[in-house]
Amino acid sequence: MSSKGKFYMTTAIAYTSGKPHIGNTYEIVLADAIARFRRQEGYDVYFQTGTDEHGQKIQEKAEKAGITPKEYVDNVAGEVKRIWDLMNTSYDNFVRTTDEDHEKQVKKIFKKLYDKGDIYKGSYEGLYCTPCESFWTESQLVDGKCPDCGREVQPAKEEAYFFKMSKYADKLINYINEHPEFIQPVSRKNEMMNNFLLPGLQDLCVSRTSFSWGIPVDFDPKHVVYVWLDALTNYITKIGYDADGNSSDLFNKNWPADLHLIGKDIIRFHTIYWPIFLMALDLPLPKQVFGHPWLLQGGEKMSKSKGNVIYADDMADLFGVDATRYFVLHEMPFENDGIITWDLVIERYNSDLANILGNLVNRTISMSNKYFDGVVKSTGVTEEVDADLKAVVTSARDKVAEKMKNLRVADAITEVFNLFRRCNKYIDETAPWVLAKDEAAKDRLAEVLYNLVESITIGACLLKSFLPETADRILAQLNAGMREYDDLDKFGLYENGNKVTDKPEILFARLDAKEIMPKIDAVREAQKAEFEAEQKALGGLPETTEETGEAIDIEAKPEIEYDDFMKMQFQVGEIISCEAVPKSKKLLCSQVKIGSQVKQIVSGIRKYYTPEEMVGKKVMVLVNLKPAKLAGVLSEGMLLCAEDAEGNLALMTPEKAMPSGAEIC
């Protein structure tokens, strides 16, 4: 197959503050599926990932651990790479921002921008969020806290260098308007335009003097380069960009990037800071930045203190690498956050991998051996049902390609499994076990099994980008090779008279939840114990972490009649999207799925939950409350909360997994 041209793609480089959990790992698996499919299509792919290793947060963690920052990041970077390799990701380059060649170019880039007049020296007095490595103004805070992570900010005053962001703001606005594909999904573009660009950009602080773990400004070494200027430039430095004009052939071939794949929480840095830095360097902008959603544990962010963190290596130990890849790829929608729970992982494993796929392959090979000693041969004895199967199979490639073109990877893998579902239906329609009882139907039986083997072969080739090891195992059992992309819309290329394996292996053995849940509980307890040991070592955790909470009494309200109570309708709802209400510091506006309907509900809980934390939660809803407007926004119900003596609120959620729409009685 001739090359369709270059395709340079990157992930965000993982911040080396700790071991990446499954939510972090999702990004590299998503990127790998895209890279593999682009290669399959015929693109010359260069896929880069790596680690972001500088900053105040890392320096503080290293000091607490009693080691140097370099020792600290060496350990974490090694762990990140181990997990990326465990997940069978096909990156071409793993970068580290402590690499000498990167540090050399960052210094040259900083000097070039300074000489150009885009960076100038001044002093900074403002508010700084250490975990996010971000400066904020008072007006940008949400309830006095960092708008990105909700943590406390600290006053900071120091001499600093600044970048003239406002100089390029209009140019960037015009670029975004003229290139609607640049920021995806569209909701991310709207957020950047309305919240940052249109209100006006302030100059950006691009150096620090209050810590030392960073790349020094070579002409003023008491300053270190702002972590985001350092980190973002890896996309060009690590493919050979040279600020002096001596860039490598690799850079000249691959820049601009075709895709930056990042988490939605860092979209601002990649769609405002990064393109403006590139404009200042007179470099073309990346073709697309995709801000993917988050993978949440049961609707909540993962936290070791809660024992709810899920790590990729734990999942791989329990379910296998490809099962882990399948889950994170299948469960992540295009725009909204995905939900992961151990129960859901087991359900998907059994229903999709063990039943739909594994059982199909095993049955087909077993019947081929039972009825024809494993020989697969087309006899030409066809029926109408064959044409429908072939239509589904030969159209699958283009359906998958269309989904992948638009980065709808979950939909793409669903299309592949739709092919396998159609094969299972074909078995039910043709009933090979019935045909086997009739000697006159022997040729028809052979044709049915040939059609199944051919269909599964094509399906396995399409599965290769998503579950590479499983695809190889299927093809090996069918005694078939990987096909060229251009042949995946053709039916009948399986070699006539070929022989499948006489010893089919089980791809995915069905799981018994009763047997595996104790293993999962052990993982949870180990996480909690590890967290408590870490915190006690740092002096940050009391002897017990159990929440006690004293009982409180509240003023009694008048009794009501039972009939009055029965007028109220309570149901379980699932929050599918949430955003802050403009011009309000207290209100959140949620779209809540209740059965088959979606209601918009405004709640005064912004102090206690971020919009991101809300998405995916199962909540208790008063659904028949008369609609009313709060701060000018229509609210069609009420979310039930509990309130303690200090007025703190907590959402009421079902104790056990309940479907959206379940009645509360």
Spans of features found by a protein language model:
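A glycine-rich helix N-cap at a beta->alpha junction
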Residues: G78-D92
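Helix-rich, typically C-terminal accessory recognition domains appended to large enzymatic cores
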Residues: K121, D343-V381, V392-V500, L622
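Cys/His-rich short segments
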Residues: K116-A169, I173
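Structured secondary-structure scaffolds
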Residues: S2-T49, D101-Q105, C149, P155-K370, ...
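Secondary-structure transition/capping motifs at alpha-helix termini
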Residues: M1-S3, R36-D44, K64-A65, P69, ...
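Phosphate-backbone binding interfaces of nucleic-acid-interacting proteins
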Residues: P542-C665
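Intrinsic disorder at enzyme termini
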Residues: I474-D564
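N-terminal catalytic cores of NTP/NDP-binding nucleotidyl/phosphoryl-transfer enzymes
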Residues: S2-V76, V95-F110, D115, C132, ...
